[in-house]
Amino acid sequence: MLGKRAKAEKCDAIDGILEESESLLEDFGGTAAGDAAIIFSCQAVEHYEITRYGSMSAFADALGMDEAKAHLETILDQESAADSKLSELAEDTINDAAAEYDEDESEHA
């Protein structure tokens, strides 16, 4: 579309989210709290992506790059849908189970 090859670059922000996720799973892996940690870690990645794709779409719009903007908007919609599904999963099942885990742990402490 732009006549240039995409290049991979290391993203310190995503690396930080993944490191935090690993730490949480070391503490809570295999529990409902661990499941909640996985979901909110995935949501942190989704939110980062939503911010980036939203910004790129705005730049494409400002530059009059309609085809690029349309493509970026499609990706942005997919990222937003994934975030919504993760929220729904957390709210419908995982958060309550994680709260019960927390209460059980508090009683035994």
Predicted regions and their residues:
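Amphipathic alpha-helical coiled-coil segments
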Residues: 1, 82-90
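Solvent-exposed, charged/polar functional surfaces in cytosolic regulatory/catalytic domains
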Residues: 1, 20-24, 78
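Conserved alpha-helical segments that form or flank metal/cofactor-binding pockets of metalloenzymes
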Residues: 1-17
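Metal- and O2-centered redox machinery and metal/ROS homeostasis
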Residues: 7, 73-76, 82-83, 108-109
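Acidic/histidine-rich alpha-helical segments that form the ligand environment
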Residues: 12-73
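Short, structured secondary-structure boundary patches
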Residues: 31, 89-93
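Acidic, carboxylate-rich catalytic segments that either coordinate divalent cations
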Residues: 95-109
